[in-house]
């Protein structure tokens, strides 16, 4: 088995999908997990205004609505959280996403005071935080906020990780990579677009250039620029298609370099890293 075939198998990516079938699969998955755990009453997700949180958010809201209808329990709810660092440049997109998702509850938490306070505390201790590292602090602070809200609402935190993100390790460890449940896992980037189109989302939500937008020295830097490879190449690779040798090398280098992100903390019994 080639490395490409092994990766595809591990991530469960199909070369072609039926959008309606995958929507139903994700909704049923979210419902089943909540019903299995009687202490859960809510799902929580941070909404950025990008493709992934728009899709995961809408799927979560639909799952919760079906749960309420099927069980007669109106205590189930979906909580969407805006988590800007100060004023978000693409706030209009975030509001467009919320309008599409129609969450039961919508909160806004400005993470800037917490992030800046942490950076200042580190500086007092003699640790100067780089812009890149500060970006990771932002991602982790967002997850702290989501888990705090979940903890007060009998909630589980939804993650937006999908195959195109997983293969490259393009997420912050214990930041946006920290979550309880991943309804998009198995889908690549273009397949996520298919689901959003099927759900009737505004094209602006899935045609905008993807960006993590964590670094202040590189505001709005496109994912594809940061990765050095296009999502089209990543998606083709995940669908078992041939890509250029250069693209294949970059993708497989990301996979190997970020393997630690796809594991729980390493114990003495783990050997994947050797």
UniProtKB/Swiss-Prot annotation:
UniProt superkingdom: Bacteria
Enzyme class, top EC level, equals: ligase
Pathway in which the depicted protein is active: Cofactor biosynthesis; NAD(+) biosynthesis; NAD(+) from deamido-NAD(+) (ammonia route): step 1/1
Q: Name one GO biological process term.
A: NAD biosynthetic process
- Which residues are recorded as binding deamido-NAD(+)? 140, 173, 180, 260-261
> Might you report a single GO cellular component term?
cytoplasm
Which catalysed reactions does the entry list for this protein? deamido-NAD(+) + NH4(+) + ATP = AMP + diphosphate + NAD(+) + H(+)
Q: Which positions in this protein are listed as binding Mg(2+)?
A: 52, 165
Q: Which CDD domains match?
A: NAD_synthase
Q: Specify which residues bind ATP according to the UniProt entry for this protein.
A: 46-53, 160, 189, 211
Keyword line: ATP-binding, Ligase, Magnesium, Metal-binding, NAD, Nucleotide-binding
Task: Name the Gene3D superfamilies for this protein.
Answer: HUPs
This enzyme's EC code(s): 6.3.1.5
Single Gene Ontology MF annotation: glutaminase activity
Pfam families for the chain = NAD_synthase
Database matches in InterPro entries: NAD/GMP_synthase, NAD_synthase, NH(3)-dep_NAD(+)_synth, Rossmann-like_a/b/a_fold
Please explain the role this protein plays, according to its UniProt record.
Answer: Catalyzes the ATP-dependent amidation of deamido-NAD to form NAD. Uses ammonia as a nitrogen source.
Its subunit composition reads: Homodimer.
Q: Which family does it belong to?
A: Belongs to the NAD synthetase family.
NCBIfam families of this UniProt entry?
A: nadE, PRK00768.1
Q: List the HAMAP family.
A: NadE_ammonia_dep (MF_00193)
Protein's recorded name: NH(3)-dependent NAD(+) synthetase
């Amino acid at each position: 088995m080639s490395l490409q075939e092994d990766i595809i198998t591990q991530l469960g990516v199909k070369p072609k999908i039926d959008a309606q079938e995958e929507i139903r699969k994700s909704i049923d998955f979210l419902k089943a997990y909540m019903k299995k755990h009687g202490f859960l009453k809510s799902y929580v997700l941070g909404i950025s205004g990008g493709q992934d949180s728009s899709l995961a958010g809408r799927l979560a809201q639909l799952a919760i609505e079906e749960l309420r209808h099927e069980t007669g329990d109106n205590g189930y709810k979906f909580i969407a959280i805006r988590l800007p660092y100060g004023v978000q440049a693409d706030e209009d997109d975030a509001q467009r996403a919320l309008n599409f998702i129609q969450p039961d509850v919508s909160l806004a938490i400005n993470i800037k005071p917490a992030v800046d306070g942490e950076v200042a505390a580190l500086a007092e201790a003699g640790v100067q935080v780089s812009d890149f590292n500060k970006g990771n602090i932002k991602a982790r602070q967002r997850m702290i906020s989501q888990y705090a809200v979940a903890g007060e609402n009998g909630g589980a935190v939804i993650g937006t990780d999908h195959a195109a993100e997983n293969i490259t390790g393009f997420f912050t460890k214990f930041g946006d990579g920290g979550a309880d449940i991943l309804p998009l896992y198995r889908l690549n980037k273009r397949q996520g677009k298919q689901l959003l189109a099927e759900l009737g989302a505004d094209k602006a939500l899935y045609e905008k250039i993807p960006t993590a937008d964590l670094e202040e020295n590189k505001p709005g830097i496109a994912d594809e620029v940061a990765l050095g490879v296009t999502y089209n190449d990543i998606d083709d690779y995940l669908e078992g298609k041939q890509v250029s040798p250069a693209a294949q090398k970059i993708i497989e280098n990301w996979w190997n370099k970020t393997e630690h992100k796809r594991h729980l903390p390493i114990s003495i019994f783990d050997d994947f890293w050797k």
